């Protein structure tokens, strides 16, 4: 596996972690949970926040859960601000209930950035929606494909342009993965 080249001498200042996990529920629905944390390596006074933060204590700690059906329709949403710089940051959490009824599909990330821009949302929870959406696709699509294959059904992409074709360098038209996955359509 390739690695980055050796770094110059340096010291860590800030770490942002985003972790997302996809789940298959027993009732036939799907869930994706995402969590974002920002941690600094130095003590922060109350200049930019409502209270001081010790080194290693999260400045931001937010979680998001989306519940989806097989068509990627969001049927439930929950956002929680566990820790934030300002005491009223969690006042925006219920705004993310507006995700219910939206579908994760092409244009989703731009749509949520528009819907939750500025004072209509939390920058960090909104930033979490992109990785959560990707995790939904990465979790659910393979399971739906496996189920179709077990039933002997053809892939839904057969005969038409697959949504993933030309979505990135690896899935570019004419690439080995595209040809293997989609045959003539991938050429």
Q: Where are the predicted features?
A:
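Short, Gly/Pro- and small/polar-rich lid/capping loops
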Residues: 1-30, 35-43
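Active-site- and interface-proximal helix/loop "cap" or "latch" segments in soluble metabolic
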Residues: 22, 38-187
């Amino acid at each position: 596996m390739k690695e980055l080249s050796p770094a110059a001498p340096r010291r860590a200042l800030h770490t942002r972690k985003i972790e997302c996990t996809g789940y298959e529920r027993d009732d036939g629905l799907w869930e994706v949970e995402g969590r974002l944390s920002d941690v600094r390596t130095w003590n922060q006074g109350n200049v930019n926040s409502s209270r001081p933060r010790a080194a290693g204590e999260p400045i931001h700690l937010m979680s998001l859960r989306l519940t989806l059906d097989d068509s990627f329709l969001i049927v439930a949403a929950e956002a929680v601000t566990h820790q934030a710089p300002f005491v009223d940051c969690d006042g925006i959490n219920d705004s993310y209930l507006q995700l219910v009824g939206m579908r994760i599909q092409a244009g989703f990330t731009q749509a949520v950035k528009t819907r939750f821009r500025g004072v209509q949302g939390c920058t960090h929870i909104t930033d979490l929606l992109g990785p959560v959406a990707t995790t939904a696709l990465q979790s659910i699509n393979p399971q739906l494909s496996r189920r179709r294959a077990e039933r002997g059904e053809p892939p839904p992409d057969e005969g038409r342009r697959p949504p993933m074709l030309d979505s990135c360098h690896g899935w570019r038209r004419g690439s080995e993965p595209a040809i293997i996955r989609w045959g003539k359509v991938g050429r």
